[in-house]
Amino acid sequence: MNSTLTSKMTVQDALVDNGLLGKGTRSLLMAVAITYAISWINWFFTSWQSSRAVAAAKRAGPGQLKRPPTLPSAVPVVGHIFQFLLGGHAFMSRAAKHYGLGVPVRINLATFPSYIVSGRDCVAAFLKDQGRQLSRIPRGLNYMEHAFGCPHEFVHQFKPRDDVDIEHQMHTALQTMLAGNGLEVLAGRYQTEVAHAALSTSLMGKEHEWTELPDLCSFVEDHVLEAATRALYGPHLVALNPTLARDFWTFNRRVKSMFMGVPKWLNPSAVRARDKMTDNVKRWQLYAAEHCNIDEIPDDVEWEPFYGSRYTRVRQKLLTKRDIMNESARAAENLAFIWATNANSVPSAIWFLLETLHDPSLEKQVRARLQAARTESTDENPLNFDVNKLTSDSLLQSMFAEILRLRVAALVVRQPTDAKGFSLPGGWHIKPKETLSMSTRTELMDPGVWNAGDAANPHPLDSFWAERFLVYPDDPRSGPLREPKRRFGAATNSEPYFSLDGCTWSWVPFGGGRQLCPGRHFAKCEILLTSAIFLSAFEIELLTDKLPGPDEGVYGFGTMPPNGKVPCRIRRRKIVSV
């Protein structure tokens, strides 16, 4: 032992004598000191800039425009990007509150500087955009190329033009066809497809036989993705691509990296997943074109088997009208729509199911509401629901609103197009081509807005409360808002009712104003019908006492899915005809 110790001391002495250990230590200390100095200087400089902006804003007189302050940063060049990547919601919420909600603040996410919009008044002005001074940023074209696979040489065809603005035309078509009779037909088709998928599944045994599943979420998302695709695109897209559901969810897990512009050579698995999906879509496009003349289908046909819904046909015709004929470019646009219609509604439906099953008392109430909405069984679908009853039920609506409040985390990004820029309440001025970002989650989790219960009966905003959006006429503390904006005494009975009164610019999972999501009504039908069918078709017992949290890795892109598996045991229920 002594010889070993002597040997170690000899080696150490030799290193010191030769100056090696001291030189390494000095180099390390020098690197730490330089890094610290650079960080401190950058923090000091950005704080000084910010203080000047705040002081100038305070000196501004009535009618004078003010420039927003910058959030201080210790890291030069890349700014706040690491804070954003480590926790998007926490960072955006902290940044929005740095000078107080309602004061726009500049952040720097590497090559993407942006001004955060927060607070009800500023969010209202931002979403209303009454002067039509804001537009989606040009990055949307990059998304078509990198996230959805449009060949670079055809991306320009999706650029807005005065004569044929394809995005506006598709938005208008979607608004028209996902309302009234169009919505009714599509919702009916959707529930038939979901019921068929649920009742014909081969993953479990006969009635009354329990089957253990490693993950309820995967079971639901695969069946619902295929059903939704059949409803919107007809049966052939699924039939031609047996692995479509798994291909889509693999793509969905990787799409964020492509949205953020990670180079192909650093992101091969994501590119492969995207290309697999575009190949699937192209296979359907070619099959449909070969077997059906789209121009011969009457305009008033709401659904047919080759193209599915009327809206899908209209979109294909608009692509042709815009002279977008390349199959890969068309596949990219179709993939973008498939992603938009499933990436948010399916995880929301799963959360609705999980929260219901996690609370036996709530499950009992929900099952009673679902039974009341059952309609006469048919040969085509033995499990029918009155969609209007589902979507107008007070408890189910409250649960729907709460799921979206708690789980949606989208970033709404716009740029001023007017030469004068864009002004927010308070006189804050944003110059042309500067970027504005609004985090829906910051507004949906604002403790100054939402009712979180009281000391005797707390309901924290980061936990699910099924009745948060229910108003009890005889209880002034009920309802979604911390400070209710309603009058009492006018109710004719004591029954609770669903309310979004006063929530217009705070409950913003679908955006708002002229950019309000046109598919919101169908999304509501999807979420409630999915939950109704799975709860009615199966008896499900969760094999975990604690639900997973939301996957904040997808922050900024819509609904955050569960961040873990949910094991369960499941068996078929006997379907009793109504």
From Swiss-Prot:
A GO-annotated cellular component: membrane
Protein topology in the membrane: Single-pass membrane protein
Known pathway: Secondary metabolite biosynthesis; terpenoid biosynthesis
Chain residues that bind heme: 517
SUPFAM superfamilies per the UniProt record, alphabetical: Cytochrome P450 (SSF48264)
Name of the molecule in the record: Cytochrome P450 monooxygenase fsoE
PANTHER family attached to this UniProt entry: 24-HYDROXYCHOLESTEROL 7-ALPHA-HYDROXYLASE, CYTOCHROME P450 FAMILY 7
Compartment(s): Membrane
Stored Pfam families: p450
Residue ranges crossing the lipid bilayer per the database entry: 28-48
Organism whose genome encodes this protein: Humicola fuscoatra
